[in-house]
Amino acid sequence: MTVERVAKDKSETLNKILITPMGRCHISKTFSLFQEHKPNCTLDNFLKLWSNMSPYKLKQYAKQQTTFQDIIIARSTNDYIHGLFTCRADNKKKLIIKHIVIPGPIGRQKVLKQFIEYIIRIGIDLKCSTIKIYDIKENDWYALFLQEAGAKRINPSCLQINLSP
């Protein structure tokens, strides 16, 4: 099954983009986009990354200091998927970000900037001391934006943002 995922017109990205945890209605489109990035991934493995957690339960997870993981998507109001990333927080106060996928040349900088804001906000909400972003190549355009947000390279494929003073 082929899913049309590349914005054809700049006006498609000018509408409000929502950064939310993936819902049940977004599984098919999000999985198709994820498979383009990781073609060997099966649906079962993809769903293991997803916690089906509402944003309201996030604060409950933070209070209980349990492990939390989810797939976060960027979508427009008409449910067009603009990008995704997976995140995992553990009780060691680390937020781990993997699999940042933002296809197409149109609007991807806007989506990445909103992802960065969301990542930092969720790290603060979960009271994490560090955010580690994996699978980032040295000359990747993602890395430039993340480094502008304060990320430091700790190894060739990982950036880290320190949230504690």
How would you name each of these model-derived features?
Residues 92-105:
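Conserved acetyl-CoA binding element of GNAT-fold acetyltransferases
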Residues 138, 149-165:
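C-terminal "cap" of GNAT-fold acetyltransferases
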